């Protein structure tokens, strides 16, 4: 049983998707009004957003990303794809940072960029799965540059050198953002650093698995073995001690995440303790939100 940012959502047919999203927004209204519905998850969310000072814009942006999925939106450029990834994953990075009492603009930027990098990895991994469901997230301009007509390919998705080149390019962009994001680890509370660094290492390793399969994510779905995950988490448990701070730690935010950073960089509430367990809990969100999103259905339990 996995946790989720919206544990009160389950899944149902796409014809109800827009109504479900509208209902989620109403529930968000109630949460921020301090009158959550009589649902455990709503009450828990109300506690977190008020106790941790989480701006509503972050959750609204996440729902916007779900709405873009409901529309079947495609992305012309990598910058457009950054905008999507900022909403469905950068928002989670920002909220994690706030839960861990890290509210400076620079570390928030790195947290959002980590979310974007993870989402790009998800997209590179799931090219075939998405295509068979009628979804295409690879930048359309990159496909054309590789000699691929996006509409024709989506109608009959096959692996070839052009797709391999686009997947490699997307992984390179994810890796660039992983390197930037790692610089934000040093700004986190010490007991949170191993978990965040471990998540960064495990997600980046998905890219290495894709490369090991010849970049064929049309016919195969790359998986990091449990043994390898444990090794990477063990590495993270000590590697965080060696994470330094360089110029990238203070680099300007990726343009697509600036609105998130601007919303989240605010005075901190009263200090809190005991964040490690909560951090590990929240680390599951990116993968869970991605899995929920890919079903293309959202169900709201309003009872």
Task: Name the predicted role of every residue range.
Residues 1-10:
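Single conserved hydrophobic/aromatic residue that forms the stacking wall/gate
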Residues 12-117, 124, 129-303:
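Catalytic cores of Mg2+-dependent Asp-rich isoprenoid enzymes
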């Amino acid at each position: 049983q996995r946790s989720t940012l919206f544990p009160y959502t389950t899944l149902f047919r796409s014809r109800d998707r827009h109504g479900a999203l509208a209902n989620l927004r109403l529930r968000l209204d109630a949460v921020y009004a301090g009158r959550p519905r009589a649902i455990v998850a709503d009450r828990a969310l109300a506690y977190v957003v008020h106790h941790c000072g989480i701006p509503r814009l972050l959750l609204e942006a996440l729902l916007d990303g779900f709405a873009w999925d409901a529309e079947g939106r495609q992305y012309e450029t990598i910058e457009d794809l950054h905008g999507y990834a900022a909403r469905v994953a950068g928002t989670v990075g920002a909220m994690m940072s706030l839960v861990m009492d890290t509210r400076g603009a620079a570390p928030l930027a790195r947290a959002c960029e980590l979310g974007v990098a993870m989402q790009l990895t998800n997209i590179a991994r799931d090219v075939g799965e998405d295509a068979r469901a009628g979804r295409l997230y690879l930048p359309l301009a990159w496909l054309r540059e590789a000699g691929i007509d996006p509409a024709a390919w989506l109608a009959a998705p096959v692996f070839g050198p052009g797709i391999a080149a686009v997947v490699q390019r997307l992984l390179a962009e994810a890796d660039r953002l992983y390197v930037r994001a790692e610089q934000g680890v040093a700004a986190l509370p010490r007991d949170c650093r191993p978990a965040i660094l471990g998540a960064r290492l495990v997600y980046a390793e998905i890219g290495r698995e894709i490369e090991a399969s010849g970049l064929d994510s049309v016919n195969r779905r790359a998986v990091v073995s449990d043994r390898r995950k444990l090794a990477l988490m063990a590495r993270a448990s000590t590697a965080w001690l060696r994470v330094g701070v360089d110029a990238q730690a203070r680099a300007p935010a990726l343009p697509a995440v600036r609105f998130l950073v601007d919303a989240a960089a605010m005075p901190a509430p009263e200090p809190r303790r005991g964040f490690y367990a909560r951090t590990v809990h929240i680390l599951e969100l990116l993968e869970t939100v991605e899995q929920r999103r890919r079903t293309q259905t959202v169900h709201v339990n309003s009872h």
